[in-house]
A protein has these predicted regions:
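Conserved catalytic motifs of ABC-family nucleotide-binding domains
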Residues: 157
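ABC-type ATPase nucleotide-binding domains, specifically the catalytic core motifs of the NBD
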Residues: 93, 100-114, 125
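Helix-to-loop junction immediately C-terminal to a conserved catalytic motif
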Residues: 48
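Conserved ABC ATPase "signature" region
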Residues: 63-64, 112-131
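Catalytic Walker B motif of ABC-type/P-loop ATPase nucleotide-binding domains
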Residues: 161-164
């Protein structure tokens, strides 16, 4: 289980998170929804200890992440797969080596036979052919880079998957491919997932519950139906804004 308790964070005079309470149950997929720049990625980085809260606590499986020692934090991170927004692939390494980096057990990482089989399996899980392993990141499309990033995140057989804007920069077709993949991995691997996104439609599709982060606070938490039925002005404002943006995008297309 992941739990944030009254977490606050500011950068200089800008309050990013203000007394945020948030939890994800085992086996659940929760979408953290909100406009760009609202602090969703900051919240996600608290979970893996890349950012420490100014106040409050972050718990993963009952462990207080801000209070873990370096070795304890490394052990916790070995159970968490993180999908970076831009893919964060190393351009000097081929796809095989990029995915291999996700194998968190050092013995398995060094075992080339195990690594080769694991990379092949991860490529299969993200619907990429084995020969993609030989390609360099520069040869991949945007959608393929995203899928390789996901393959690396699952290479260590994590308990948790954290997705930071997995469909950002993709067209609607490739966004649907990634959303379908997130759903399937949840079913096949049984992982607990947090999906950071600004896409209302995608969040409604992949998540068991949605948490709306707006103006530094969690404004609503619930199923897609509950979010749509909310009378909270902040929730309605965000949904109307997303609808307007979708209409404008449709006109451009």
């Amino acid at each position: 289980m992941i739990e944030l308790k009254a977490v606050s964070k500011r950068f200089l005079d800008h309050v990013v998170l203000d007394q945020v309470d948030f939890f994800v149950k085992r086996g659940e997929t929760v979408a953290l929804l909100g406009p760009s720049g609202v602090g969703k990625s900051v919240l996600l980085k608290h979970i893996i200890g890349l950012i420490r809260p100014d106040s409050g606590d972050v718990l993963v499986d009952g462990l207080s992440v801000p209070h873990l020692k370096r070795k304890e934090l490394a052990e916790l991170r070995s159970h968490i797969g993180y999908v970076f927004q831009n893919g964060a692939l190393f351009d000097s390494m081929d796809v095989f080596e990029n995915i291999r980096l996700g194998i968190t057990n050092e013995g398995q990482y060094r075992d080339l036979m195990y690594a080769a089989e694991r990379v092949r399996e991860c490529l299969r899980l993200v619907n990429l052919q084995p020969e993609v392993a030989k390609k360099m990141p520069a040869e991949l499309s945007g959608g393929m880079r995203k899928r390789v990033g996901i393959a690396r995140a699952i290479a260590g057989k994590p308990t948790y998957l954290l997705y930071d804007e997995p469909t950002s920069g993709l067209d609607p077709v490739n966004s649907d491919v990634i959303d379908t993949l997130i759903e399937r991995l949840q079913q096949e691997l049984g992982v607990t997932s947090v999906v950071v996104t600004h896409d209302v439609r995608g969040s409604f599709r992949v998540a068991d519950r949605i948490a709306l982060l707006w103006q530094s606070k969690i404004r609503a938490v619930g199923t897609a139906e509950e979010i749509l039925a909310s009378h909270d002005p902040a929730v309605q404002q965000f949904l109307e804004r997303d609808l307007e943006m979708a209409v404008l995008q449709g006109r451009k297309d």
